[in-house]
């Protein structure tokens, strides 16, 4: 029943249910509501579960059926089980460190592969691993975002292929094991920066590899590196050297701040011409020097370099072709030496309407690099204005020196400062002496501007450096002679050059360089510049000169200044040319603009210069250097600046101004001083000191003589132009033209300044290497070498002086630089060849030329021959050429500066201009000698000499040998000019002996004078081949022995000089007449050539310096020559010879080696006894001709020797080194020389004995006399026995005193030897080494020093002086005692010599004091000599 009852299908039951349900539904029921709510929640959770189980509803939709609760629950259970199983597996493999995917944080949701890239993205870098070999083991894919390389491209490639080469070392350091890098522990992690190569764009790749290389770009990446990863190491493989890095870009804030850049814009037309300039940005920055920056940038951008088209042209072409262009980076230097890196971006602007190109817009971006210049950068840069190329700017000293070179000059500048400062201090009196003139003031700037960095060492080491002239002259070398100390005061131009030259000084450069210091005369500066160019020395110094600012600044001070018209023309042309030569420099380009314009002439000049430079080995290279270019430019500019004060317009006073302005530091005081001098002296001084060029000299001469300067190419303005034009055509031709002009100009005897033949001298010949155009027009620039010297030197005396100076410079510098070159026998041959060429030219031009002109020409030729030999020895060394020019300048300066001391009155009578020229020449040479060889004492004393001193000495000398002076007036003037300068060198020397020396010099004539000047300076170096060496030899004692060997001159030379001089001094008037006759006879070249052949000059030249020296010695004095050998060969011989040579050397030092470069000469003499013969060689041609004249007069040397013996005192006064000696030597052949030497030896032995006795007796007296002489130094008896010895040989002829001590040395009677023995202190130095102090020079001491040492009394005083003169004194003192002891026999001369020695010592102490001393000593010796040598002194006293 129940079952049935329960059966739902039972109808009876169904109905009641329905009823119940309906009844229940009629009202609310809590039970129903609860059930419903539960169902709803169940469905909701199931849906949520389904969402969790299935990734998305799409998966649900993908199901064939709509998931019900059961399906959802089923899937849920399935996944839960999977998770459980996964957890179990993970737990089994679980490491100590819980895995992220197992972490309860839910990180398992993040894809493991995405985590690395996400981290690299956050770091802004890429990941790479490098093994020990530097190969990339792994690199992340995002490397493409940074380096544009694909992952595959870098995998297994060397990491160094993408690293900048500069970062390889840093990367290796981090890659190597820590134990290898620093030997100590290192953190496993470290950070470093490196530059990585960015793959070029596809476009760049398509352009080609070159383009890629050109456009390589590096991205600076900061690398975080970890080495020695522990986990990897433990895996069994050693990856400890593996580097794991994350590289990221360096944040902007961490990137180095680039140096601030400046920019300005320019607009150019389609032809590249700048139409507008916008410097708004530059002005806004207001950085100092922005105007100069813009100017120099444009100059550099538009200047040509290395024969290529300029940046601007190439850039402009590229812009027109492509529409835009970026120039390569180029550098240039500002005036302060700051180097600027610049590049230019340009775009072609087109018309919007026609699309036609309208203009080019250029943006010049400039970045100033750290100033490379140092010490004097500001000084030099500001003063010079323009600087050299940036590379040159690296040397602040040099820049300061030149002021124009920011770099190169800078280095020299620092040296310069030392050179100027050191030498000044060293010089003491010398510096002070020059300080008086404006020179010292200029020196401060010159320190920055002058290429004296190289000089510094030489200056300090060499007497020349110690000498006032050198010390100050060098600083003033950049300055115009007016502002500069006179050449003599400034010091020997050749010394300064040699100081620079040795380095190459000049290169040097800078020595420029150069050393242009002493050659403050235009010639000297030019020579230094060219010398620096030729030597390549430093003349990077020169480049600064080329800078426009520098140019402007230095033009006024340039010794190279030419006449105003000439300067004006040349100012633009030269500047252009200099720029053309150094067109490479942007600065030079600017300078060109400043000069006036960039003209074709500039190109031509550059070409000429290039060709000329090619001719002169290395000169072209030097010229190519911007520094050299700047130096030449500066020289030229100096000339331009000198324009304001045209030399022709200036009176003799002006000339003196220029020469003395260095002295007085103001042209007015100099002018006043010059005015006090006679017109001839003034002209000579001015020509020597102020004349920037031959044209200037010609102008001055014309003013003095009333002649027109327009006669020849030497005319001031036109002459310069002509010279410029001619020189480019052919240096030789131009020289010939100049020589013709000078010869035709009829250099008056009195007006040595008129003697322009110097323009033709071998200097020019050698100079052909330089552009002829530059030689003359640019001579101001190139003056440093040869052509300019010719231009600078007056047509007559200046040329003669120039020749002598060139010889001296060559001798000094070449010997210093090339000791061997001096000794080359080829020198004589070259000199002879040059002489012949010049003589031929002269002969061609001689027709219609006055005898005087021809003489001058011959002198010049002879000198040129000497110079040529020297140059040949030097093998075309421009520095030597420069040196001669420098010497010439110094001569000029000396004339102004020293002439007052030496030849105010003394030589005024005979031929003041000549004497002055000679004095200036000799003085300059002396100064040069002082500067070059280190005969500081001599140089110093010489400055001490006053015009009055010189005057007294010169006047005394002239009165003593007035006839010779008159007879040989002009020749002597030439010679005297130099000898006079030399004479002051020997303050202790007797005035009379100096006079005697003058007489022989006068007898020798202009040509002889030149020769003598060259010779006396080198008298000890008589060998012509050694002429280049004489100065150097004197400077270099080591060279002396070779010189002694080279020529028997060491002993014979001084004696021969004396002998020759005695011949000349037989009768001043007769000698002068004979000289005139001889010159007239020799007027034509053929005649001269025949005479030379008759005299055996060609053979002598071919034989070499030794032979030439001997020949010269013989002509000068058989006795002297013969005595010389004994002196050199034997100590006693040296004494005797010293006695004679002492006087001769003493005079020679003062006169030639000593006079012009007292200290220098002495040292030179010391350095090589043969130097004097070398000097003699210079004088050789003149001496030979003079000898011919003498022969015409006496037809034999014996009469001459007898007169010399009789006039031994006169010979002393004349000084053996004087041309007279040389003259006699010329005619003497080898046999004669040998015989004379033997005679001299025997005489010397006898004289030595007598001298020793006399010296022993008179040593004390002489010492007292020396003191007196020192006190009397200022009295004007600047001519000590030494001087007397030089000039004393001629005096010897008249005076027996000289033979007393030196008769054996020379043909002079023993009396002469005795008298000269008093001078032996100097003679001793002359006989072996220098004309003045050859005997002592043989010992290494300068002629003056030697002479001083010759007499015991003098020796002691000399020792004292030696103390005063550290450089020359010690040498003097060393040789002085022996010589003095030897010469004690010549009591008179001994006393004189003692005085002279004192004077020499004083010279050691200071040139001025020495010069003063010389005058005093002369008087003292004359007055106090009366001891044993008083009789000998008699004739000299008579002359006095």
UniProtKB/Swiss-Prot annotation:
Residues 1-40, 388-409, 453-521, 539-571, 583-656, 704-731, 948-970, 1287-1306 are annotated as: Disordered. The keyword Iron-sulfur does not apply. A motif (LLXXLXXXL motif) lies at residues 1074-1082. One of its GO terms (biological process) is intracellular signal transduction. Residues 625-639 have a biased composition (Low complexity). The keyword Transcription regulation applies. Residues 112-183 form the PAS domain. PROSITE patterns: BHLH (PS50888), PAS (PS50112). It is found in: Nucleus. A motif (LXXLL motif 2) lies at residues 684-688. A motif (LXXLL motif 3) lies at residues 739-743. GO terms for molecular function: nuclear thyroid hormone receptor binding; protein dimerization activity; transcription coactivator activity. Residues 511-521, 555-564, 607-619, 1292-1306 have a biased composition (Polar residues). GO terms for cellular component: nucleus. A motif (LXXLL motif 1) lies at residues 631-635. Transcriptional coactivator for steroid receptors and nuclear receptors. Coactivator of the steroid binding domain (AF-2) but not of the modulating N-terminal domain (AF-1). Required in a nuclear receptor pathway to suppress expression of dorsal mesoderm genes. May play a role in the positive regulation of the circadian clock. Contains three Leu-Xaa-Xaa-Leu-Leu (LXXLL) motifs. The LXXLL motifs are essential for the association with nuclear receptors and are, at least in part, functionally redundant. The LLXXLXXXL motif is involved in transcriptional coactivation and CREBBP/CBP binding. PANTHER family: NUCLEAR RECEPTOR COACTIVATOR, NUCLEAR RECEPTOR COACTIVATOR 2. This is Nuclear receptor coactivator 2. The lineage of its organism: Eukaryota, Metazoa, Chordata, Craniata, Vertebrata.
